[in-house]
Amino acid sequence: MAAKQGIKSRIRPISLALPLVAFIAITFLMPLGNMLKESVYDAEVADALPNTMRLLNDWDGVELPTEEVFRTIAEEIVVLQENRTIGKIGIRVNRVVSGTRSVWGKTARRVKDVETDNMITTMVEIDDRWSELDLWQGIKTAGQRYSAKNYLQAVDLTRADDGSIVSVDEQRRVYNTLYVRTLYVATVVTLLCLVIGYPIAYAIAHTPPTLSKILLLCVLVPFWTSLLARATSWIVLLQSQGVINDFLVSLRIIPDDGRLSLIYNMTGTLIAMTQNLLPFVVLPTYAVLSSIPPTYMRAAASLGANPVQAFVRVYWPQSLPGVASGCLLVFILSIGFFITPAIVGGTDGQLISNMIAYHIDTNNWGLAAAISVIVLVSVLILYVVFDRWVGVDKLKLN
């Protein structure tokens, strides 16, 4: 009897946690697993051109495929045209070999009415790109069900004809630049939030209760406003004929013909993101500062320390758990920020999250998933490094 009671006492807390486990599995683990699968698995071309892909598996890639391969792909192109799916295959292969999308539609319209004993010559006459090895290599690459091509493309690499991994052409190198820019923006926004947020948190923690509540309310107000509305409001403030420029011109700080460019660039991204993420530094820092006894500073002063020495040697070290919590939150959120750079960032202020959204909009789920995995792994590495240097157990959020 006692044993049964012991088992029940152990099962009861586990059963209470089951809804939470199910929620995490459905909303986090399953989407994460699907994202990992999408980044390495793509059967669209393989399912559309099964016979062609079977023949291309034995192709050496040195010379053009045989007449059998040409005839087989021509027959399958006709079927795709009848099913109205030829455009999808053209888009998919075009992601591997740019400039080949039109080949598929052009060939589909003309090859169905052709009866010939030499399909190689016929298809080359329809479009001479069928005589290029790059196109056939692209078809073979796009037809692989499992591959790392999305991860290679996500770091501006590609696989050469001989199988080696090389950098893509300079004009196509965009992702590594966006990674660096995203890290730069996340770092700058984190520092700006710290520089601006620490004094605000200090003021909230050390002012009379009435004023402290008003300041805290001002910090919390942005959470009650839509992120989209806040981002859009910055257009009114920062544009060349906006409030800030008009104010500076009215004070004759800048001439009317020398208005500042504060929107649709990196400056707009930094300003808007700092304002949006500032509460995530203020609140954890305030929670820690309010718990520091004021007697510590008085004791340091009584021992001969001036205000600066007392702050640096006594007050600042005790506030680090809150500072570290806020900075970590802001940095991680900055890496994945999307809507604000999209609205106020222009071309120069776009981050890697905007590229993920672009590939989702164009149905390039594999590349979007690969970039997302890279960003996720980067954040996990950051977390591990932070835990090693600072210690996550020392963080305080309340």
Show the residue positions of the predicted features:
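Transmembrane-helix boundary motif in ABC transporter permease subunits
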Residues: M1-G6, V189-L220, V236, S291-M297, ...
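Membrane-topology segments of multi-pass transport proteins
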Residues: M1-S15, N34, E38-N176
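Interhelical loop and adjacent transmembrane-helix boundary motif
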Residues: S9, A46-N51, L55, A342-D387
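Membrane-interfacial helix termini and adjacent extracytoplasmic/periplasmic loops
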Residues: A2-G6, R230-T274, V344-T347
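Amphipathic cytosolic juxtamembrane alpha-helices at the membrane-cytosol interface
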Residues: Q5-I7, T210-S212, M266-G268, T295-S325
